UniProtKB/Swiss-Prot annotation:
Expressed by the venom gland. It is found in: Secreted. Interacts with vasopressin V2 receptor (V2R/AVPR2), probably in a selective manner. Inhibits vasopressin binding human V2R in the nanomolar range (Ki=7.34 nM), and also potently inhibits vasopressin-induced cAMP production (IC(50)=26 nM). In vivo, intraperitoneal injection of this protein into rats increases diuresis by 8.6-fold, without any loss of electrolytes. SUPFAM superfamilies: BPTI-like. One of its GO terms (molecular function) is serine-type endopeptidase inhibitor activity. This is Mambaquaretin-4. Disulfide bonds join 5-55, 14-38, 30-51. Exploits its two major loops and engages more positions in its interaction with V2R. The pharmacophore defined by numerous amino acids positioned in loop 1 (9 to 18) and loop 2 (34, 39 and 44) may be at the origin of the absolute selectivity of this protein for V2R. InterPro entries: Kunitz_BPTI, Kunitz_BPTI_sf, Prtase_inh_Kunz-CS, TFPI/VKTCI-like.
Length: 57
C-alpha cells in the first residue's frame, strides 16, 4: 500500500462540509469523515471504493 495511506486523517482548517473517506491502519478499513475543503493530506478519497482499492491490503 502507498505510504500516504498511513497518514492520520486530516479534515483541514477550512469550513466546508465534504463527505470523504480515509484509511485507518489500526482497523485496516476505510472510514468516512467530513473534509473541510482545503489542505488535508493524501489519505483522503472521494469514494470508499477508491479508498479500499488503494489502501486495504
Amino acid at each position: 500500500r502507498p505510504s500516504f495511506c498511513n497518514l492520520p486523517v486530516k479534515p483541514g482548517p477550512c469550513s466546508g462540509f465534504f463527505s470523504a473517506f480515509y484509511y485507518s491502519q489500526k482497523t485496516n478499513k476505510c472510514h468516512s469523515f467530513t473534509y473541510g475543503g482545503c489542505r488535508g493530506n493524501g489519505n483522503r478519497f472521494r469514494t470508499i471504493e477508491e479508498c479500499r482499492r488503494t489502501c486495504v491490503g
